[in-house]
Amino acid sequence: MTTPAAPRLRIGVMGGTFDPIHNGHLVAASEVQQHLQLDEVIFVPTGQPWQKQTVTDGEHRYLMTVIATAANPRFTVSRVDIDRAGTTYTIDTLRDIRRTHPDAELFFITGADAIQQILGWKDVAELWDLAHFVAVTRPGHDLTESGLPHADVRLLEVPALAISSTDCRARVGRGFPVWYLVPDGVVQYISKHHLYRSPQ
């Protein structure tokens, strides 16, 4: 008599610059984890994003992400993009995660604005083979199921938090507080390491 196969792990992959990571990222990941019953959400800070010229050092962004996610047992952080040389592309991220989790069902979590541009991403045809895609929207966003670029993209509305990393950096640069916009430990990390002191 054969024993039934163990169910496949369901793993979310949330890539981002996380410069800095903020509460909007965490709420989105938590909502997706709950709605899709994911076993784990892996946060993957990008190394050198292909669409951005200047970002804070990867080690700082990695450590802020570790601090921000530490309290949630379903959240982990991967260094695959930080440690890989060269420009970061989603296809490389998913190939690396697939190598370390060969039997898992992967769900790549991204914003609705990014998903509308996905057809221009590197090796887009292979992306659909590596993972399902989850497009996170906020109430009032005009993206609908009919506007999705591929059948294997799921639309999920999450609570609206009008927070952006760009605004957080600018606030720090102007001497304004970012308490309650980013996790407390990240606020302290930014202060300790004098990040974002010049307006960006």
Curated annotation (Swiss-Prot):
Pathway: Cofactor biosynthesis; NAD(+) biosynthesis; deamido-NAD(+) from nicotinate D-ribonucleotide: step 1/1. InterPro entries: Cyt_trans-like, NadD/NMNAT, Rossmann-like_a/b/a_fold. The keyword Transcription regulation does not apply. Its EC number is 2.7.7.18. Keywords: ATP-binding, NAD, Nucleotide-binding, Nucleotidyltransferase, Pyridine nucleotide biosynthesis, Transferase. The keyword Disulfide bond does not apply. It catalyses: nicotinate beta-D-ribonucleotide + ATP + H(+) = deamido-NAD(+) + diphosphate. It holds the Pfam family CTP_transf_like. GO terms for molecular function: ATP binding; nicotinate-nucleotide adenylyltransferase activity. Coiled coil: none annotated. GO terms for biological process: NAD biosynthetic process. Belongs to the NadD family. Catalyzes the reversible adenylation of nicotinate mononucleotide (NaMN) to nicotinic acid adenine dinucleotide (NaAD). This is Probable nicotinate-nucleotide adenylyltransferase. It comes from Clavibacter michiganensis subsp. michiganensis (strain NCPPB 382).
